[in-house]
Amino acid sequence: MTDEKRAFPKGNNHIRSETFNGSVSHKISESIKDIASLRPHGKYTVQDIDNIIASTSSHENRGQSGDSNGCINHDEEGDIPMCDLNDESDVEMISEYLSSQREMEAQSVANYMPKINDDLPLLNPPTLKTAFVVDTNFIISHLNTLEKLRSLSSTYHHLIIVPTTVIQELDGLKKSPDIARDNDDTTNQEHDRTIGTLARWGNDWIYKNLANLDSGLIGQKLKQSLNPGSLKDDSILDCCLYFKEILNCFVILLSNDKNLCTKALTEDILTVSFRKNMDAKIIAMRAYEENQLRFANLRDSTVNNFDQNVTSYAHIPGIETPPLQFDKVSQNVFEQVKETIFFAIDHTLRKEYGEDIGFIDYNPDKLTTIENASNYIYLFWVSVFSELFTCSKIKKNEWKSLPTVLKSKPTNLNDLRTFEQFWETVLHFLFSKFTNEEKQSLEKQIHEWKTSINAIST
């Protein structure tokens, strides 16, 4: 049987294939004992053995002595090795290696679709959900940082999303014999490891966390794509855009691929790439702060001013107290319009998102005021409602600050007419894709409102 080396661009001296030399078996045995003595419950894994073989083979002439575990950490149960590559040249090499693999294996990637467990965990962040979309090179180069970032998900209200393409690429790399070598022998204790070993560690980490619904990590569903035919870098960017535009998330791309990061930045998607001494907590904290800075006001303004607006309007000097009959009609029309608005928004969002409704920043229990409802229209304007209002002059920003007369119970006849006419127009747009039966029910309701208003104006 012959050993075939995988093709790789010329001029790169970081990748090489090596075979196991039986003469170092004693060193391997001793290294396994060293690892077992340091690991919880004396555990060691197949990946540890792979790592020791590569490490011992490449360093047998350097006089290594029992340092095979290097800078490798493990998860809490001691099952999955976690490491970060701290040398910038190594990180760049991994990125270039994966780019070359994407060019060579584009067709095979397109034809392979592994099934993954991607049920959504129940998270309730205070603002738009932060979604870290992770590239293959980031998993291979910075698995330890990713694990720490995942462990902070409940504290900083974020998710890590693994695109389908990344799972495919890791699966294709798991048998690669090529070695990611650290050149700086004097300052870095990381040992040579094969790309296949690093890919298997990444696969194990993804599998373990996908099996846990509360892990803070999910996989991209096959239907969660704007362009299902996209490949390689474009498919990862497509994943980012889906979660940004359709599921209304605050998306941050984790990648060391400069070309992919450039594409993401042109789409207004923030990116995080390798930096010396990169820290997961700082990444999580800054992402949370940026989320708050950009989107907190959307929710803060929803409820706080409603009661104040109604009260201040009701006590403006000079407004006459309407007769009892007007009060009754105004109250009935106001409540019925409000409930119809709530129904239209809830129905539209559920029809658009289906089973993903629990993932978006929508809570039907908070549909308690017209101001709340208008904020949901504002929040989902780009992804849902703008299409319904194509022929309307109403713009997105107008939903953020509707006049009080359009949000509260009318206190005089002119305000009641204005209120009814505005929401009649809006409801026609909201119902534009409803069934004919639902549209007929709306027209019947509108007719009753107009009849009641006309009755008290004569």
UniProtKB/Swiss-Prot annotation:
Deletion causes a slow growth phenotype on synthetic medium at 37 degrees Celsius and leads to decreased transcription. Deletion has no effect on ribosome biogenesis or frequency of recombination. Deletion is synthetically lethal with a deletion of each of the THO complex subunits HPR1, MFT1, THO2, and THP2. Involved in transcription. Probably functions as a transcriptional activator. It comes from the Eukaryota. This is Transcriptional protein SWT1. CDD domains: PIN_Swt1-like. GO terms for biological process: nuclear mRNA surveillance of mRNP export. InterPro entries: PIN-like_dom_sf, PIN_dom, SWT1_C, SWT1_Regulator. It is found in: Nucleus. Residues 130-262 form the PINc domain. Keywords: Activator, Nucleus, Transcription, Transcription regulation. Belongs to the SWT1 family. GO terms for molecular function: RNA endonuclease activity. SUPFAM superfamilies: PIN domain-like (SSF88723). The keyword Transcription applies. One of its GO terms (cellular component) is nucleus. Interacts with the TREX complex and RNA polymerase II.
